Curated annotation (Swiss-Prot):
One of its GO terms (cellular component) is cell surface. This is Enolase. Pfam families: Enolase_C, Enolase_N. It comes from Bifidobacterium animalis subsp. lactis (strain AD011). The lineage of its organism: Bacteria, Bacillati, Actinomycetota, Actinomycetes, Bifidobacteriales. It catalyses: (2R)-2-phosphoglycerate = phosphoenolpyruvate + H2O.
Length: 430
């Protein structure tokens, strides 16, 4: 047993300069855990509630002192003395203490900070790296990095409709080789854009954010960059998209404002079909809005044997919503974000449910990040085979990629790179 001795929260800043929560948790055997909570720019309505202060005179209303107070004055007294290694009991207590379906009283950012801090303290107490503590001896698969090399949507100014254009370097023997390829394509893309007279400023997640005429133009430049870097599009490196369609969906009209026009779901489905035929796309995240269950089921039936359709806003890492998607055949892949559901235990439940039902899982960062590397360890621990954590730029993104390099080295000959097996769509390129 590693009894919790103290819990303390403070307000810090994330990668966008917005306040977030840091929690420090100490146990009686000298272990210490640090919980750093990320934050999203485009968020699903069904996500657990992120508690913000709302005082416009302080950090423009984005302060989190209320969440900090909830940890220090409400959660801490209840969890002191509990066993940090009993993650389920700790998380269940905080959920019960909150008493709402979406953690809408204490705040998911307060609860997750404590949940993560306890996880790290427990791993340190057990003298195990985090991936080994979570996954036991089974965790050994290094994930394919889905690298967001062009930013649009809510992550950039002058944006295209599509929020993230990612490369997926799956045609390699090791993670380190795949990372190298991704980095080389990223740097090559900068030169490709410069030659076209396009800006190479960066978006929230480190990808380039030039002003594009069409969504397809972004894909064409990425294809050029892959080839110019010496790699084969499709065979070695595929393309993944995060459309984030809820961001440009109008509830009143039931239409998507896309490419400058109001489009219905049939138009969007046809657009995706043509895109998949034209480019080596292996993954599309949030192709339809977060309550468009029937449209999700339709596209999964039409194209789900060719690529993965990843539910982010649709599932929000919530086992209840994921179960609905499984039953309806809506989507075939889960995006995993710890702060969408708000506890480590519920996150692990969602991954397990996805795996048991033949869904892939992609562990993800948020646009407002910290130097925390939990998602790297989590991806290996649960052998998810996929991670998305931005471009190979900006310290908070690089930290995750570097942590995976460390894990690969630690695992040695037992390390396995997910590669082609991570994606259904890759089969047609083998």
């Amino acid at each position: 047993m590693a009894a919790i001795e103290s819990v303390y929260a403070r307000q810090i800043l994330d990668s966008r300069g917005n306040p977030t929560v840091e929690v420090v948790l100490d146990t009686d055997d000298g272990a210490r855990g640090l919980g750093l909570v990320p934050s999203g720019a485009s968020t699903g309505e069904a996500e657990a509630w992120e508690r913000r202060d709302g005082d416009k005179s302080v950090y423009q209303g984005k302060g989190v002192l209320g969440a900090v107070k909830a940890v220090n004055e409400e959660i801490a007294p209840k969890v002191i003395g509990m066993d940090a290694t009993d993650q389920r009991a700790l998380d269940d207590l905080m959920i019960e203490l909150d008493g709402t379906p979406n953690k809408g009283r204490l705040g998911a950012n307060a609860i997750l900070g404590v949940s993560l801090a306890a996880l790290y303290a427990a791993a340190e107490s057990a003298e195990l790296p985090l991936y080994r503590y979570i996954g036991g001896t089974n965790g050994h698969v290094l994930p394919v990095p889905n690298m967001n090399i062009m930013n649009g949507g809510a992550h950039a100014d002058f944006a295209t409709d599509i929020q993230e254009y990612m490369i997926s370097p799956y045609g390699f023997q090791t993670y380190s080789e795949a990372l190298q390829a991704g980095v080389e394509v990223y740097h090559t893309l900068k030169n490709v854009l410069k030659k076209q007279g396009l800006a190479t400023g960066l978006g929230d997640e480190g990808g380039f954010a030039p002003k594009m005429k069409t969504n397809e133009d972004s894909l064409k430049y990425i294809m050029d960059a892959i080839s110019a870097a010496g790699y084969e599009p499709g065979k070695q490196i595929g393309i993944a998209l995060d459309v984030a369609s809820s961001e440009f969906y109008n509830k009143e009209t039931g239409k998507y404002h896309f490419d400058g026009e109001d489009r219905d779901s049939e138009y969007m489905l046809d657009f995706y079909e043509k895109l998949v035929d034209q480019f080596p796309i292996v993954s599309i995240e949030d192709p339809f809005q977060e309550e468009g269950w029937e449209d999700w089921a339709k596209i999964t039936k039409a194209l789900g044997d060719r690529l993965q359709f990843v539910g982010d806003d649709l599932f929000v890492t919530n086992p209840v919503r994921l179960k609905k998607g499984i039953d309806m055949g809506a989507g075939n892949s889960l995006l995993v974000k710890l702060n969408q559901i708000g506890t480590v235990s519920e996150t692990l439940d969602a991954i397990e449910l996805a795996t048991k039902n033949g869904f892939t899982s992609m562990v993800s960062h948020r646009s407002g990040e910290t130097p925390d590397t939990t998602i790297s360890d989590l991806a290996v621990a649960k052998n998810t085979g996929q991670i998305k954590t931005g471009a190979p730029a900006r310290g908070e993104r690089i930290a995750k990629y570097n942590r995976l390099l460390e894990i690969e080295e630690e695992l040695g000959s037992t390390a396995e790179y997910a590669g082609y097996s991570a994606f259904k769509a890759c089969r047609k390129y083998m």
